[in-house]
Amino acid sequence: MTENKSFKESHPLDDFISDKELSNTTIQKEKLTIEQQKQVDTISKQINPLDNEGLLAFGSDLQKQMSQFSHQMLDEVQSKDVGPIGDTLSDLMSKLKSVNPNELNTDKPSMLKRIFSRAKSSINEIFSRMQSVSAQVDRITIQLQKHQTHLTRDIELLDTLYDKNKQYFDDLSLYIIAAQQKKLQLENEKLPQLQQQAQQSTNQMDIQQVADMQQFIDRLDKRIYDLQLSRQIALQTAPQIRMIQNVNQALAEKIQSSILTSIPLWKNQMAIALTLMRQRNAVAAQRAVTDTTNDLLTANAEMLKQNAIETATENERGIVDLDTLKRTQRNIIETIEETLIIQQHGREERQLAEKELQQLEQDLKSHLVNIKGPNKQS
């Protein structure tokens, strides 16, 4: 930001006025150019001695222009509120921060299903949110471009106001120099003549003319002071205009930086982060597929080994196991032996039964014989 002193030192007419008190400002006429001196002489002739009304109007047009200029400056400052620009920039920063690339960098254990479904869903959600924010950022960008256009116009307008203010300063400086030149002329030439004439005359009006001239010189001195005040206002206005311009320029540069740097960088970084996340998920998916393939190969190899062992074992076995043959033979022998025993028991029982039957038959015959004998005797 340019300091007030630099504006003052940079002005071409500042060298004509010393750094004493404002009311005691003196003119360094030797630093005037020939053209400026001609202008001063012309302006000085506008001051007619004892013309109080003309003295009151001396430089008043410039002061009126200064007053109008001050109102224009006030309107410019009041109508250009930079608050919305700051709010728009803050809104932009808020939108840019609402989607954090770190959200794409979550390292958590995941299964194959999570990688292909949940992770994909998470990326899509963030991508959808990023698209929404990007659309909002684009709308904010349009607002910022409008603000930048207004700021650029304001800067150009302030340049015009600065040039006008500089012209007021230049003109007031010449009017002050002309008035001071006229004052010196009246004090050194006209007033002594009137004083000498009054001393040599007995006419009281000559004495009144001396008093009137002294009062006119006093009014001229006060008029010079008023013009110096106006000039000082113009001098102080210059850095104020530049400060407003600097603020507008800084805002315009900030907006341009946001539009041309921050926003494209944000979009690039989000695209890069999303691409890296997709790559990482692809690698994780490939790793999961590889791990699953290895697990399947290992399981299949283990199953093949078990099947081979069992097959070889079965191949080495006979159709009928020896133990089975032994157990079968033992069962057959036991069956034969039990059958023989049963047959022997059956034979013995039959023999016993035959003996009993023979005995029964014999008993029956004997009984029958006994029954026939008594019948014959009777």
Curated annotation (Swiss-Prot):
It holds the Pfam family TelA. Disulfide bonds: none annotated. Coiled coil: none annotated. PANTHER family: TELA-LIKE PROTEIN SAOUHSC_01408. Belongs to the TelA family. This is TelA-like protein SAB1262.
